[in-house]
């Protein structure tokens, strides 16, 4: 019973978040240096990282505002710089 309760609580919290936002940060394989933002599901914030310029994944946003909008983060919860 406790397991089911925990499962539904976790599922409910993750339900409203865009799936792309749950992907891990991925700097990509190239060696460029593009400042970008990603959603950190542990801190529940959009955080800055340096993108290499190719590959990577969809958890990669040009601006803090874009990351917050897509991932449903309130501005006062961000930013956290790496």
Curated annotation (Swiss-Prot):
Pfam families xref list: Kunitz_BPTI (PF00014)
The record's annotation in PROSITE patterns points to:
BPTI_KUNITZ_1, BPTI_KUNITZ_2
Specify the domain of life of the species encoding this protein.
Eukaryota
Leader sequence range is: 1-16
Location(s) in or outside the cell: Secreted; Nematocyst
Pro-peptide residues, renumbered to this chain, are: 75-82
According to the UniProt entry, its GO molecular function terms are: potassium channel regulator activity; serine-type endopeptidase inhibitor activity; toxin activity
Role noted for this protein: Dual-function toxin that inhibits both the serine protease trypsin (Kd=30 nM) and voltage-gated potassium channels Kv1.2/KCNA2 (IC(50)=2800 nM).
What family name appears in the similarity comment?
Answer: Belongs to the venom Kunitz-type family. Sea anemone type 2 potassium channel toxin subfamily.
Instruction: List the protein's name.
Output: U-actitoxin-Avd3f
Please report the organism this UniProt entry assigns to the protein. Anemonia viridis (Snakelocks anemone)
User: Taxonomy-wise, where does this protein's organism fall, top ranks first?
Assistant: Eukaryota, Metazoa, Cnidaria, Anthozoa, Hexacorallia
